């Protein structure tokens, strides 16, 4: 069997590039998306390449960005607009393969192994996608072409903007091994610091390191990263549309900034619970188990679940259970990088269960009616037409429509 052909497409400075299309008067001028420009608070979600040359970085406070780039223009995020462009990009991708795995709004893996006989080899497909993104959407992409997902993403990061980089088996040692180990997917700041203590500064250093030593200091992440560096990633690109029976419904997200307190977590859990509950209702299911997954900023992760009293697809109930599970199981030893909510042990809407005389049937019926009304308002007028008051406490964390974006980040590497 021959090598797989995997692409990773990354929309360059996604939010900023789309805003430039809608603000032609800002052509050639530095621009950043994020926060509340009028109130001058919040952080930079993305900056264009002009602003980056001045030192503006994602996650930087707006006031800091203004200091390093006095002429910068800030615009508030418009997630509905960015999601529309993301969907249009995926429509282009779908003409080459149905094996698409989104990684956020702006990135996507494509398995085009079965498309080469009709569309040409991976490099040709990447060139065609790049050309079409420019001509049809007005934005540029960087595309990595490789035999696995890890090196395909490394290829898309290798050169920006508007570039195509191959990372074939015959060349990845020459191209990848000289790069800083921090360029490898899932090597965060803390892991990078640990590796540096052992003299591991490049991907090549990591590939040549003793796997047992890495395991002793990093746990199973040591073996995972060692295999990535050596090109042994065999993780599949997941089909975009799967018609297998639904056994659970979940969403997870890597947040735009680390979560550092209970309030941060509550906001994100409610966003994810809204998505899970809405998708349960759409498919005619309720869940009898609520599960959360948490990963800290050192990539240590855990999963906990709770059997609940009544099968539910009520947003508030799922969110409350998720938050209760979190409070009972996390001690805030480290900030949180990503979090997920899942409804499992599903039953259909017509499932009959014993009514507890002490439970508030009337209250639950009101909550169900409220959820149905919210579903209808959002269907007619858009996701952001109605929001919970909680979401206004942090507009950066609450700026994600988890249901529509449906960017369940790939956690399969971590079990």
Say what each PLM segment does.
Residues 1-227, 237-240, 278, 364-415:
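Gly/Gly-Pro- and Ser/Thr-rich, intrinsically disordered tail segments characteristic of DNA damage-repair
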Residues 8, 183, 191-336:
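DNA-contacting surface of Y-family translesion DNA polymerases
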Residues 14, 37-40, 297-300, 346-349:
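Short, charged/polar surface micro-motifs in flexible loops or helix N-caps
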Residues 108-114, 303-306, 353-359:
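Short, hydrophobic beta-strand segments
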Residues 147-150, 230-231, 286-297, 336-347, ...:
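A glycine-rich phosphate-binding loop feature that marks nucleotide/adenosyl-phosphate handling sites
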Residues 323-380:
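C-terminal hydrophobic structural anchor segments
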């Amino acid at each position: 069997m021959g090598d797989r052909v995997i692409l990773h497409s990354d929309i360059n400075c996604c939010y900023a590039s789309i805003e430039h299309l809608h603000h032609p008067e800002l052509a050639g001028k530095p621009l950043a998306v994020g926060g509340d420009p009028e109130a001058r608070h919040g952080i930079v979600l993305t900056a264009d390449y002009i602003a980056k040359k001045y030192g503006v970085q994602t996650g930087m406070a707006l006031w800091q960005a203004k200091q390093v780039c006095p002429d910068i223009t800030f615009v508030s995020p418009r997630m509905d607009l960015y999601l529309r462009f993301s969907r249009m990009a995926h429509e282009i991708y779908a003409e080459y393969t149905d094996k698409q795995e989104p990684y956020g709004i702006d990135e996507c893996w494509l398995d085009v192994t079965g498309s080469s006989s009709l569309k040409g080899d991976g490099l040709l497909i990447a060139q065609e996608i790049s050309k079409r993104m420019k001509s049809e959407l007005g934005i540029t992409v960087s595309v990595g072409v490789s035999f696995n997902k890890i090196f395909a993403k490394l290829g898309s990061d290798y050169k920006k903007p508007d570039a195509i980089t191959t990372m074939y088996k015959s060349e990845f040692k020459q191209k990848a091994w000289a790069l800083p180990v921090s360029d490898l997917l899932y090597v965060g700041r803390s892991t990078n610091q640990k590796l540096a203590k052992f003299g591991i500064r490049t991907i090549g250093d990591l590939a040549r390191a003793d796997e047992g030593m890495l395991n002793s200091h990093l746990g199973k992440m040591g073996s995972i990263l060692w295999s990535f560096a050596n090109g042994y990633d065999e993780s599949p690109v997941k089909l975009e549309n799967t018609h297998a029976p639904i056994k659970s419904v979940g969403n997870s997200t890597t947040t735009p900034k680390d979560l550092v307190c209970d309030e941060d977590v509550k906001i994100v859990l409610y966003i994810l619970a809204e998505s899970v509950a809405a998708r349960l209702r759409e498919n005619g299911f309720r869940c009898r188990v609520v599960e959360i997954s948490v990963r800290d900023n050192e990539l240590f992760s855990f999963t906990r679940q709770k059997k609940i009293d009544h099968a539910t697809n009520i947003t508030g109930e799922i969110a409350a259970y998720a938050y209760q599970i979190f409070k009972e199981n996390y001690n805030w030893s480290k900030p949180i990088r990503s979090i997920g909510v899942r409804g499992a042990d599903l039953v259909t809407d017509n499932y009959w269960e014993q009514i507890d005389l002490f439970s508030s049937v009337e209250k639950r019926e009101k909550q169900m009616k409220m959820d149905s009304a919210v579903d209808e308002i959002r269907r007619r007028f858009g996701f952001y037409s109605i929001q919970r008051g909680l979401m206004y406490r942090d507009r950066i964390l609450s700026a994600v429509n988890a249901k529509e974006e449906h960017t369940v980040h790939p956690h399969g590497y971590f079990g």
